[in-house]
Amino acid sequence: MCPRNVDGKNIADYTFEEFKEKIFPVLKKEGVKFSSIGSPIGKVGIDDEEGFEKQKKQLAELVKIAKLTGCEYIRVFSFFYGDKNPKDCTEKVIARLKEMLKIVKGSGVKLLHENEKKVYGDVPERVLEIYNAINDEDFVLCFDASNYVQCDVNPKTAFDMLKDYVVYYHIKDCSKYKVEVPVGTGEGCYPYILGELKKRGYHGFMTLEPHTFKYAIFKPIV
């Protein structure tokens, strides 16, 4: 599983000691393992200095949690650009991601970048730009087709651009009206993407995201 919240609390709000004492024994007893840690790290404004400093401390704790649970990946984002032109944020985004990378270096844990609406890496061109600029084995990519639909990007185009660098997939779908829908009924191009992954012999993780029902529950499925 890929935990976002554990026992009613965001995974990033746990200290290592608290997680080790309260949560890990339950996971161990029930045989639950993490494919990645669904952290919100990087989901702050690019100019939010206080928020970034807080998240660096949280990331350090998450690295210890990841090692404890035998988890290889910590999901991260590339900062909200707000009202700015994303092109004006490039250097700062890459610099901050490199700061985050220093925190995981040598731990055996990798940063897993997810494309997300309104963060710098919300379109495949900028995701690839980030990936190439960082150019480190401990910075890898997670592909979310639905999030690309939310950004008016064709997921097939994004997949073809990034498929050689993606190690992890989030599975949810979205209609052309930006409404979350059952996988395979939206614009996520899943028949193509899954077919291509089968041809390529993909053996990595895929995470279903049932929490996204809340975005669609009061909207028509179209």
Please name every model-derived segment.
Residues V26, V44-L141, Q150:
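Active-site acidic/histidine proton-transfer and metal-coordination neighborhood
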Residues M1, S35-I37, I74, Y169, ...:
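Hydrophobic residues within beta-strands of alpha/beta enzymes
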Residues D13-E21, E49-F52, K56-A60, P124, ...:
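Structural motif corresponding to alpha-helix initiation and N-cap regions
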Residues I11-T15, I46-E53, N85-C89, V153-N154, ...:
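Short, solvent-exposed loop/turn segments at secondary-structure boundaries
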Residues M1-F24, K28, F79-N85, K178:
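Glycine-rich, proline-tolerant flexible connector loops at the mouths of alpha/beta enzymes
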Residues P3-V6, S39-G42, F79-Y81, E114-K118, ...:
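Active-site beta-loop-alpha junctions enriched in small/polar residues
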Residues K28, G70, P124-F143, N147-V222:
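Histidine-acidic metal/acid-base catalytic patches
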Residues E17-E30, R96-I103, A158, Y192-E196:
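Catalytic-core regions built around general acid/base machinery
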